[in-house]
């Protein structure tokens, strides 16, 4: 049997660089402290054996490279190789390399694919998927805690039967589905057999029904022939009467034409005058608008001039203040220059005096060379004797110099502070002047602002009042327009409606008595509930304009085109062709004629209303409307109260979403008064709009007031800032500087006292040093003729010090005056720049004021000219209005003449209308009868034409499409008039009936007979007339279903066979593993327990298909009774889990077994038993590589591999190997030592 010989690792996890681990003995233990990298060694073995990355405790392959988890990878690659040794064969090397983000596999240094790599390992008994070669840390406890289902999953994984689970489920579903299909086709076949029997019975019933139906058809033909015959007789009679009346009307028309021509000429003249009047009104509006635009420009120009004048006054004051300040600053600078000249003069006089004194000195203490040498020697000797005193004096000198520097610094600071106080006083003076100037500007601005606010208030009140009134007018106009027009129309629609109303008023004024108005304005539903229904029936004709004649209609159309108005529909009363109202329809229950629920005024517009409504019926609900429309022998046009319309042709249209809004237009009352009110409100709106146009002037004033207010606000803010910030800050800084200046005196005095005190101490030291010098220089002083050596030394130095001190005083004075002079020069330049700037500002403002005054005069002149032009236009408008009124009076007289002639014509037209109505009704009746015959498939005997010549369009739908609809219906009637019916089949007795009562009686008799036959037919349940076709269809379906059933049965058999095959293969795999483990587990458990009384056994919950349910595992510990696995102690559970683990390994065992801390949960007794068992098995069955932390365990091994950590950026694992075979097991129980 082969074994794992060596492991070579390079940069894998905690193993940095290349390390060779091994050789591995048959029983090798891996030891080391926690965190040293023991488990990483097990991960390396798992890695080289093809384990997935997710099981190696990392997310990506790159994380396996040493240092990668902390962002410092040791290299860009890592590898692990394994040397596998087998008796009688050459060693083989298996390697896995991390290159980039992927793995590379090698066998004996040859790169191979993963599947080849896996196959070679499987040949050695190493199953990568089953992981039969290793046990991870904690796996023993996990196995001990598994429930039966989890144990089944473990066996599925080991036996690889789980690989077939997906295919097993798929085949099972296919088998179940095939069986269901078979069952379904069986029931379907059974049902179709029943249908075949039923179809035979239906065919017999259909034959009997057809015979009765033929008898009914013959009765229907007889009834329809009777109705049509008498209808044609009546139509011929009415046509003769109508021709006579039309001749009389033609004569009256010629008389009216002459009057109409005269009226037309007057209308043209009036139209021209009104256009001229409108043009003048347009020009007045334009001039008024122009004037409103010019006024704000004039106001703005005037305001700009006023503002610039105020600005100039402020600039002049600023110039005066700047000049005054400049003169004062110039005087201060002159004083400083005089003082500077005075100091320079005093310095020169001092220098001249010193020069004279130097020349006038007689005595000169000059030593000979030997005396100089002697002086230096004696000086050195004196220094040595007084060294201690000299050092002490030197220390005093250093301290004295430091204090003198402090004194000079304080005095310099005092001078600077005095200069700063002087500067602050000047700044305070400037602040106070600025405050005075700002207060003066604020007072002036407030006065201007009050004036602007007053003007703004007046304009605001005027504009707001105009706005409020405009809102009120608009609300009233909206209410009027809502009543006059559609409630949902938007502003554009309101404007459009207003335009249409204006045109309507114009044509009524131009054609009085000829133009009656819109249909909606001339009629009203009798009750509110009929509003929607009437709206639906009238449709587009609601807004149609009713005129007396076609000629008037064409004149109106021409006028509308000239005015560029929208297209309108006209209904000329002399042109419309209407059918008479069918009186029988008034007898129908649950329905009323639409024309009967409408009130109309004047009466002579009835023809237009008849044209729009036809014989339409209104019903309370949709069900009644549908029943009446299609339920009887004759179809009718009906409408429900909710607006649902049923056409004779079968078309049904529901109530549109805007139908209710349109229907609300019927609620308007006193339309004429509302129109007058609308005109009045429109005129008032124009006047108020003129006032509202002052809003531009108001905005200009508001803008100026806002600008002035903002300037005032900024000035007040500047004043407040100057007072509370600049002035207060300067005063505060001045006080602070004065306080500092007051503190300089005591500090300077303190320093002077310290210096004076130290001078006394230095004087005492000096006297002691002088005593030493006097002793040393006593003889030398006698030689040169001085009292002491200091007299000789000071004679030269004293004079020089006095001169230097005086010169320093002069330099300090010059420096101080120079600094002040430079400061004053800079301030003087700033003052001079301010004077220049204000001079330029004054000059610029004066030029701008001159320009602004000219601009103001120009605007005033334009306003005066515009006002004059406006007044001239108003005068023209009044004159033109008077001319229009005169022309209207002339036209009124002509219209009166035309009205008289029109009355005579109206009387004749009424008679014609009555005849035409009856004639139209008869034609409509004939059309409806023919249409009903065609719809009901009643074959009439025709001598000319065919049934296809009968139109299916509705005969009474004239109201739907205005004049074009009327022409269409007339063409239908004309086409149907060409159809000649053969009345040969009609009994002569029926033809001879003349009186209306006699005709009605005969018709009722025929109808009653037909009703009885239809009643018999209706009592018979309508059979399936296609029974024969159904019978043939059912026979075909039966054969088809039989074939499908047989095919489904074969598919089910095939699916079952496929399922049984995969089921057997899965069972064989699982059972082979299970039987092997179940056979070996008892023996292994006895060996682990070291007791033959121990028992372990496995049992499947489902013996037929064990992989579908759990596997029970029970053990009886030595010397104990049977207890469930959960009741075993921790050690007993671990031993039982190990027994199961080793038993599973015995099925297709791998050549080596890697275990990670399997002894973790074992006590000392069980550790020894498990270690001995592994040791025994490693000699013959498998190689064991165990990670352990317990000495009782790893001392049983043949070799040890020690892992220890080294610290770096991350843990670095190092390895030691130790061969225990060289050391016999002298103490098998280490605990006794």
From Swiss-Prot:
ATP binds at residues 32-39. Changing residue 496 to C: In CDLS2; affects the affinity of SMC hinge dimers for DNA; mutated hinge dimers bind DNA with higher affinity than wild-type proteins. Ubiquitinated by the DCX(DCAF15) complex, leading to its degradation. Phosphorylated by ATM upon ionizing radiation in a NBS1-dependent manner. Phosphorylated by ATR upon DNA methylation in a MSH2/MSH6-dependent manner. Phosphorylation of Ser-957 and Ser-966 activates it and is required for S-phase checkpoint activation. GO terms for cellular component: chromosome; chromosome, centromeric region; cohesin complex; condensed nuclear chromosome; cytosol; kinetochore; meiotic cohesin complex; mitotic cohesin complex. It is linked to Cornelia de Lange syndrome 2: A form of Cornelia de Lange syndrome, a clinically heterogeneous developmental disorder associated with malformations affecting multiple systems. Characterized by facial dysmorphisms, abnormal hands and feet, growth delay, cognitive retardation, hirsutism, gastroesophageal dysfunction and cardiac, ophthalmologic and genitourinary anomalies. Belongs to the SMC family. SMC1 subfamily. The flexible SMC hinge domain, which separates the large intramolecular coiled coil regions, allows the heterotypic interaction with the corresponding domain of SMC3, forming a V-shaped heterodimer. The two heads of the heterodimer are then connected by different ends of the cleavable RAD21 protein, forming a ring structure. This is Structural maintenance of chromosomes protein 1A. It comes from Homo sapiens (Human).
């Amino acid at each position: 049997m082969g074994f794992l010989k060596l492991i070579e690792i390079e940069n894998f996890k905690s193993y940095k660089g290349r390390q060779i681990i091994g050789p591995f003995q048959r029983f090798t233990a891996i030891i080391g402290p926690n965190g040293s990298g023991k488990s990483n060694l097990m991960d390396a073995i798992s890695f080289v054996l093809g384990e997935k990355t997710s099981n190696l405790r990392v997310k990506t392959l790159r994380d396996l490279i040493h240092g990668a988890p902390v962002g410092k990878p040791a290299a860009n690659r890592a590898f692990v190789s394994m040397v596998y040794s087998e008796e009688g064969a050459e060693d083989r090397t298996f390697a896995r390399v991390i290159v980039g983000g992927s793995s590379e596999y090698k066998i004996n240094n040859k790169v191979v694919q993963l599947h080849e790599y896996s196959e070679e390992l499987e040949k050695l008994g190493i199953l990568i998927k089953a992981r039969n070669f290793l046990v991870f840390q904690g796996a023993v406890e996990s196995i001990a805690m598994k429930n039966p289902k989890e144990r089944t999953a473990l066996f599925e994984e080991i036996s690889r039967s789980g690989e077939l689970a997906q295919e097993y489920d798929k085949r099972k579903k296919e088998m179940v589905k095939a069986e269901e299909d078979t069952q379904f086709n069986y029931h379907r076949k059974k049902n179709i057999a029943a249908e075949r029997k039923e179809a035979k019975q239906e065919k017999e019933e259909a034959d009997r029904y057809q015979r009765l139906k033929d008898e009914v058809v013959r009765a229907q033909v007889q009834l329809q022939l009777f109705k049509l015959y008498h209808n044609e007789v009546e139509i011929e009679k009415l046509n003769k009467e109508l021709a006579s009346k039309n001749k009389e009307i033609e004569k009256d028309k010629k008389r009216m034409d002459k009057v109409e021509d005269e009226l037309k000429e007057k209308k043209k003249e009036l139209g021209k005058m009104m256009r001229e009047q409108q043009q003048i009104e347009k020009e007045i509006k334009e001039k008024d608008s122009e004037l409103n635009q010019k006024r704000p420009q004039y106001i703005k120009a005037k305001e700009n001039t006023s503002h610039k004048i105020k600005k100039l006054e402020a600039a002049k004051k600023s110039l005066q203040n700047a000049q005054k300040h400049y003169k004062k600053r110039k005087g201060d600078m002159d004083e400083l220059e005089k003082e500077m000249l005075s100091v320079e003069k005093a310095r020169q006089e001092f220098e001249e005096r010193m020069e004279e004194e130097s020349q006038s000195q007689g005595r000169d203490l000059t030593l000979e060379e030997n005396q100089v040498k002697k002086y230096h020697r004696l000086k050195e000797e004196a220094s040595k004797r007084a060294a201690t005193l000299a050092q002490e004096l030197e220390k005093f000198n250093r301290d004295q110099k430091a204090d003198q520097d402090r004194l000079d610094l304080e005095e310099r600071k005092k001078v600077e502070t005095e200069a700063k106080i002087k500067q602050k006083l000047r700044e305070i003076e400037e602040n106070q002047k600025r405050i005075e100037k700002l207060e003066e500007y604020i007072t002036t601005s407030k006065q201007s602002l009050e004036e602007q606010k007053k003007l703004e208030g007046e304009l605001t009140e005027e504009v707001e009042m105009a706005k409020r009134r405009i809102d009120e007018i608009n609300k009233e106009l909206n209410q009027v327009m809502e009543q006059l027009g559609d409630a949902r129309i938007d502003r554009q629609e309101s404007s459009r409606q207003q335009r249409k109303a204006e045109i309507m008023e114009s044509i009524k004024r131009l054609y009085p008595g000829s133009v009656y108005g819109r249909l909606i304005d001339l009629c009203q539903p009798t009750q509110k509930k009929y509003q929607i229904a009437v709206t639906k029936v009238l449709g587009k004709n609601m807004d149609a304009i009713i005129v007396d004649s076609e000629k008037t209609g064409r004149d109106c159309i021409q006028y509308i085109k000239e005015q560029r108005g929208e297209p309108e529909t006209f209904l000329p009363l002399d042109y419309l062709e209407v059918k008479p109202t069918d009186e029988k329809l008034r007898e129908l229950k649950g329905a009323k004629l639409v024309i009967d629920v409408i009130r109309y005024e004047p009466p002579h517009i009835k023809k237009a209303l008849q044209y729009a409504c036809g014989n339409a019926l209104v019903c309370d609900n949709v069900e009644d409307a549908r029943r009446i429309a299609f339920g009887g022998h004759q179809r009718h046009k009906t409408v429900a109260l909710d607006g649902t319309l049923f056409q004779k042709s079968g078309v049904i249209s529901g109530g549109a979403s805007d139908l209710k809004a349109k229907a609300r237009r019927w609620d308007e009352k006193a339309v004429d008064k509302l129109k007058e009110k609308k005109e009045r409100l429109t005129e008032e709106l124009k006047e108020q709009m003129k006032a509202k146009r002052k809003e531009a002037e108001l905005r200009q004033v508001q803008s100026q007031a806002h600008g002035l207010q903002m300037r005032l606000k900024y000035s007040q803010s500047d004043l407040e800032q100057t007072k509370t910030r600049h002035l207060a800050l300067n005063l505060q800084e001045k006080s602070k500087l004065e306080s500092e200046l007051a503190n300089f005196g005591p500090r300077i005095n303190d320093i002077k006292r310290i210096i004076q005190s130290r001078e006394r101490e230095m004087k005492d030291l000096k006297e002691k040093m002088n005593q030493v010098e006097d002793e040393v220089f006593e003889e030398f002083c006698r030689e040169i003729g001085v009292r002491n050596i200091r007299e000789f030394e000071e004679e030269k130095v004293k004079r020089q010090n006095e001169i230097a001190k005086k010169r320093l005083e002069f330099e300090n004075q010059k420096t101080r005056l120079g600094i002040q002079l430079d400061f004053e020069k800079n301030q003087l330049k700033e003052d001079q720049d301010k004077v220049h700037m204000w001079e330029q500002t004054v000059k610029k403002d004066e030029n701008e004021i001159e320009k602004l005054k000219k601009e103001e005069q120009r605007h005033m002149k334009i306003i005066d000219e515009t006002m004059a032009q406006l007044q001239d236009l108003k005068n023209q408008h009044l004159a033109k209005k008077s001319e229009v009124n005169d022309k209207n009076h002339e036209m009124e007289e002509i219209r009166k003449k035309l009205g008289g002639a029109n009355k005579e014509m109206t009387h004749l037209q009424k008679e014609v209308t009555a005849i035409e109505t009856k004639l139209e009704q008869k034609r409509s009746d004939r059309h409806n009868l023919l249409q009903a015959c065609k719809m009901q498939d009643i074959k009439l005997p025709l001598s000319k034409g065919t049934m296809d010549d009968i139109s299916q369009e509705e005969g009474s739908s004239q109201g739907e499409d205005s004049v074009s609809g009327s022409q269409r219906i007339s063409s239908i009637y004309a086409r149907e008039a060409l159809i000649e019916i053969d009345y040969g089949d009609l009994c002569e007795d029926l033809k001879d009936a003349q009186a209306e009562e006699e005709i009605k009686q005969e018709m009722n008799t025929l109808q009653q007979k037909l009703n009885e036959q239809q009643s018999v037919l209706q009592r018979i349940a309508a059979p399936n007339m296609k029974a024969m076709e159904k019978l043939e269809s059912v026979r075909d379906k039966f054969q088809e279903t039989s074939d499908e059933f047989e095919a489904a049965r074969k598919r089910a058999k095939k699916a079952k066979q496929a399922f049984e095959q995969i089921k057997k293969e899965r069972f064989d795999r699982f059972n082979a593993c299970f039987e092997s483990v179940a056979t070996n587990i008892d023996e292994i458990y006895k060996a682990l327990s070291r007791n033959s009384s121990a028992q372990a056994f496995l049992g499947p919950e489902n013996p037929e298909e064990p992989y579908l349910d759990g596997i029970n595992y029970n053990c009886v510990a030595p010397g104990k009774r049977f207890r469930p696995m959960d009741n075993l102690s921790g050690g007993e559970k671990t031993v039982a889990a190990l027994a199961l683990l080793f038993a599973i390994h015995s099925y297709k065992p791998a050549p080596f077994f890697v275990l990670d801390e399997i002894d973790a949960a074992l006590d000392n007794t069980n550790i020894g038993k498990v270690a001995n068992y592994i040791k025994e098995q490693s000699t013959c069955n498998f190689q064991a590589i165990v990670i352990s932390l317990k000495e009782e365990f790893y001392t049983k091994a043949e070799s040890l591999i020690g892992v220890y950590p080294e610290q770096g950026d991350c843990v670095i694992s190092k390895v030691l190997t130790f061969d225990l075979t060289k050391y016999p097991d002298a103490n098998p129980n280490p605990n006794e030592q």
